[in-house]
């Protein structure tokens, strides 16, 4: 047992002072214990380096630095365990989540027989809102949701979640294709085909799962260059189509086309023409494989009651009086140069009058078309039209020669969501929810290539069954104009159909 020499000396001194008054005896005793203390101190074993914690026999600068570093590391670990509260004035992190919608199954669906090697696929169409078209006056409630750094993350989350087999996009910014769309879609297992009209900053895109399909042909349709059905003016709109072979069986495949038709509220005449050209050219391309399915999906800027829709989907043509009135007013309308620009880019700034904004941003509905051409503002009479303007009936003739198209949402949505299938031809109320306009503009069509065949029961056309449709929100579920944080990244909502093909 080790006893401190200093403690012993003090104890003895106290005892002698109290009980023995002889000074010499006290001095002698204290001297003896001082010597004993020194010997005991010398006999304490020296601790080996590293055998226990504590300072060395003498402190060096290296030792001090080492201890300082240990203390800093300990403080850093402790700080890492404590969450750092953001400054009270820091903005909250942007919510890149989105409203997830369910696929609604078609009742009484029955798959094809297994020996036919049927393939389940999903087809999406989505106008993703070009960044170059955005003006804040058009999206007064969108705030931070308009910034590409935020919208792009919402788009990425949405595409990853729905993961369609095939997809069509419109208003795809050309500048974002290499570093965003190709990287995102490539990472999700897609290949893509992108094309844009001359002088445009955005275009249209088709993408497909490379594990299932391989592109062997593509076609670009330039509506302005079509001399057989000349237009009144150049709009720079285009369409495109790809032929995709199945990886597991190259003798089988499909055709997929997309487009973005002329946007203007008074543009029904041009849309009727462009729709006729699109179906004609896609059908011509598809003649190489008569048994393959043909899908056409995109933003047609066409309400179901607009003239172009019944021209695409009824045989014989069934054009009601409302649609006839729309096309006649459109034919009589005279466009100005500025009206051929993009729909959002051409809108007025916040400093312009509200009346001008209203005039420029009307929707493609009968309420947006003047009752007579006399109401056309004189400032628009800037003759950009061609000298020869064919009558719209010539477009009807081309439509009648084309194969008929069936809208998959018109066919099936009333069966899965009847309370939201009250629009013309049983469509949902809207696919576009903007500030100045809300309506149904986007479609997924399938081409009926052989009208001489009677379509079997539970098939849309020969060899194609509709299995499910992506739910479209009710108007009552919507808020201000999209895009909005945590809701939708575009002013359009995506459509998607699940079909089985053989």
Swiss-Prot record:
Keyword list, A-Z: Cytoplasm, Exonuclease, Hydrolase, Nuclease, Nucleus
Location in the cell: Cytoplasm; Nucleus
Compositional bias annotation for Low complexity: 363-376
Residue spans of biased composition, Basic and acidic residues class: 341-351
One Pfam match: Exo_endo_phos
Cellular component terms (Gene Ontology): cytoplasm; cytosol; nucleus
Region (Disordered): 338-379
UniProt cross-references to SUPFAM superfamilies, sorted A to Z: DNase I-like
Entry EC no(s): 3.1.-.-
Gene Ontology biological process terms, A to Z: rRNA processing
An MF annotation (GO) of this entry: poly(A)-specific ribonuclease activity
Family: Belongs to the CCR4/nocturin family.
Protein name: Probable RNA exonuclease C9B6.11c
Organism ancestry: Eukaryota, Fungi, Dikarya, Ascomycota, Taphrinomycotina
């Amino acid at each position: 047992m080790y006893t401190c020499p200093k403690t012993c000396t003090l104890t003895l001194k106290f005892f002698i002072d109290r009980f023995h008054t002889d000074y010499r005896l006290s001095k002698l005793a204290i001297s003896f214990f001082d010597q004993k203390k020194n010997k005991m101190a010398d006999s304490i074993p020296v601790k080996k380096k590293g055998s226990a914690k504590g300072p060395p026999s003498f402190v060096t600068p290296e030792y001090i630095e080492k201890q300082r570093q240990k203390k800093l590391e300990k403080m850093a670990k402790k700080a890492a365990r404590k969450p750092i509260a953001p400054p009270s004035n820091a903005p909250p992190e942007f919510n890149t989540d989105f409203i997830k919608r369910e696929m609604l199954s078609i009742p009484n669906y029955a798959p094809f027989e297994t020996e036919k090697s049927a393939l389940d696929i999903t087809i999406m169409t989505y106008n993703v809102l070009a960044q170059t078209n955005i003006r804040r006056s058009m999206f007064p409630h969108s705030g931070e949701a308009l910034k590409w750094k935020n919208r792009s993350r919402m788009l990425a989350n949405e595409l990853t979640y729905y993961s369609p087999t095939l997809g069509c996009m419109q208003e795809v910014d050309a500048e974002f294709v290499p570093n965003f769309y190709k990287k995102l879609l490539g990472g999700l297992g897609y290949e893509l085909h992108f094309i844009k009209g001359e002088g445009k900053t955005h275009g249209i895109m088709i993408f497909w799962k490379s594990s299932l399909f391989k592109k062997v042909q593509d076609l670009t349709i330039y509506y302005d260059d079509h001399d057989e059905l000349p237009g009144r003016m150049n709009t720079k709109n285009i369409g495109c189509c790809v032929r995709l072979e199945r990886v597991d069986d190259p003798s089988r495949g499909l055709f997929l086309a997309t487009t973005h038709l002329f946007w203007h509220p008074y543009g029904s005449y041009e849309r009727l023409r462009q729709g006729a050209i699109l179906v004609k050219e896609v059908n011509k391309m598809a003649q190489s494989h008569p048994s393959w399915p043909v899908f056409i999906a995109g933003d047609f800027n066409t309400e179901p009651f607009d003239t172009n829709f019944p021209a695409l989907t009824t045989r014989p043509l069934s054009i009601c009086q409302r649609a006839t009135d729309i096309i006649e007013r459109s034919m009589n309308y005279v466009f100005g140069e500025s009206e051929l620009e993009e729909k959002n880019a051409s809108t007025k700034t916040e400093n312009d009058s509200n009346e001008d904004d209203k005039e420029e941003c009307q929707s493609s509905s009968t309420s947006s078309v003047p009752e007579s051409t006399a109401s056309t503002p004189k400032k628009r009479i800037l003759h950009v039209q061609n000298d020869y303007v064919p009558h719209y009936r010539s477009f009807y003739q081309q439509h009648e020669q084309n194969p008929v198209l069936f809208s998959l949402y018109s066919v099936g949505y009333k069966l899965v969501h009847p309370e939201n299938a009250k629009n013309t031809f049983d469509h949902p109320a809207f696919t576009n929810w903007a500030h100045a306009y809300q309506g149904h503009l986007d479609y997924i069509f399938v081409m009926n290539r052989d009208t001489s065949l009677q379509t079997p029961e539970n098939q849309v056309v020969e060899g194609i069954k509709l299995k499910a449709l992506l739910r479209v929100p009710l108007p009552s579920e919507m808020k201000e104009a999209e895009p909005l944080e945590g809701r939708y990244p575009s002013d359009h909502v995506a459509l998607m159909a699940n079909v089985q093909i053989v």
